Amino acid sequence: MRTRRDVPADRSGRSRVSRHPGLSVPSRTLEPVQELHDAPLAPLTTFRLGGPATRLLTATTDAEVIAAVREADDTGTPLLLIGGGSNLVIGDKGFDGTALHIATRGFRLDGTTLELAAGEIWTDAVARTVEAGLAGVECLAGIPGSAGATPIQNVGAYGQEVSATITEVTAYDRRSGETVALSNADCAFSYRHSRFKAEPERYVVLRVRFELENADGLSAPLRYAETARALGVEAGDRVPLTAARETVLRLRAGKGMVLDPEDHDTWSAGSFFTNPILTDEEFAAFRSRVAGRLGAAVEPPAFPAGEGRVKTSAAWLIDKAGFTKGYGTGPARISTKHTLALTNRGEATTEDLLALAREVVAGVHEAFGVTLVNEPVTVGVAL
């Protein structure tokens, strides 16, 4: 990790924000694009759930983002960062502090190097890379949210993860008061995890840099069997970029994983639970539970996840534990298209959603001895 520039200390001994070309950072003040008080947060999330924030700021430049963060840190005000809102579960009581909506924009392509501002809409950016003939993120089409969230979660789907193409993340380090550049190794990526997720109070992502591939209009080799089957090719083959993107969008839409305000199956955070990663011993015990419940002929999904570790399918677990598509009678239910998505049918509260999530977690654990972990970040509530 490196800072953009050596930063002298101010009279208090605290380092000032590092300034790099094109970034002018006000020391203490912010002129927000928008400032609201007792502001509803539900419209900023894909669940459309959650109570109000004491104060809501919207920032459209890196300088505004940094100044807002510094102001909150200097005054000891709790701070909630919101990008696309696709990975947030906010409590019904809301957030007692400042919510900062990061709405920065920026798409810069230099050869095969792509740099995105944190607030750039992710699925739009993917579409533009495909139009430019560059491979590496085409199977991540349709994922809701902003570019700045992708390294935090190490976003992945249909055989691709952003950790494979991210080369650098520019972030504001709240501990040092500097703008820093983190390499891929610095980010400490793992399955749906990163340094940013491990230290959520430290880094504010400002920009993300990717190294893509010019493969003469072809995709990266397909790594996901479902995508390959849908395209009529073998895993490992390349296909036209547009075909790969359109196929993924079609597959996602069929599971309610492409945002549509008229479709309550998309009023969700996409996959609500991560796929469990088990040790070999845990997986052996799990297989025994499966055999006892479903019969010796049934083999649970198993994917290598590093030495001595196996990943299995959360969606399979949920379904086999008896939680089928559309499960639930209240305003929060499992999607009618995909068992891994919990949805707001229009009148739900966050507590309704959490009650359903807890029921699923308890049911899966009782059936198979595996504990599901939520993928979305919870604010003011816990599973």
Swiss-Prot record:
Its EC number is 1.3.1.98. Keywords: Cell cycle, Cell division, Cell shape, Cell wall biogenesis/degradation, Cytoplasm, FAD, Flavoprotein, NADP, Oxidoreductase, Peptidoglycan synthesis. It catalyses: UDP-N-acetyl-alpha-D-muramate + NADP(+) = UDP-N-acetyl-3-O-(1-carboxyvinyl)-alpha-D-glucosamine + NADPH + H(+). GO terms for cellular component: cytosol. The keyword Transport does not apply. One of its GO terms (molecular function) is FAD binding. One of its GO terms (biological process) is cell division. It is found in: Cytoplasm. Pfam families: FAD_binding_4, MurB_C. InterPro entries: FAD-bd_PCMH (IPR016166), FAD-bd_PCMH-like_sf (IPR036318), FAD-bd_PCMH_sub1 (IPR016167), FAD-bd_PCMH_sub2 (IPR016169), MurB (IPR003170), MurB_C (IPR011601), MurB_C_sf (IPR036635), Oxid_FAD_bind_N (IPR006094). Residues 1-13 have a biased composition (Basic and acidic residues). The active site is at R192, S271 (proton donor), E375. Residues 1-26 are annotated as: Disordered. Its cofactor is FAD. Pathway: Cell wall biogenesis; peptidoglycan biosynthesis. Belongs to the MurB family. HAMAP family: MurB. PANTHER family: UDP-N-ACETYLENOLPYRUVOYLGLUCOSAMINE REDUCTASE. NCBIfam families: murB, PRK13903.1. This is UDP-N-acetylenolpyruvoylglucosamine reductase.
